[in-house]
Amino acid sequence: MAHNNIEYAETIALKAVKFILTDDETQKSFITTTGILPADLEIMVKDLNFLGGVLDFLLANEDKLLEFCTNYDINPEEPAKIRRLFPGASYD
């Protein structure tokens, strides 16, 4: 079920942050890729640019994306659909 509101999109992105932080391998990859440390996340999670970047991180790794979607019972197409609601989305 696709949703086109930012509140829903933020909820999914925050679940993605939780998923990233609870898996050591994914967390290390996220830190290496972004340079953002877990201690900085309390402030960062309020930034829509950051939340869009979190979705980009998962969208770039299909295995992790599918694991996230399975864990949270989310349609695997949903993160890509809601990504466009955040700043910096690519429309190609």
Could you describe each region identified by the protein language model?
Residues 1-92:
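Metal- and O2-centered redox machinery and metal/ROS homeostasis
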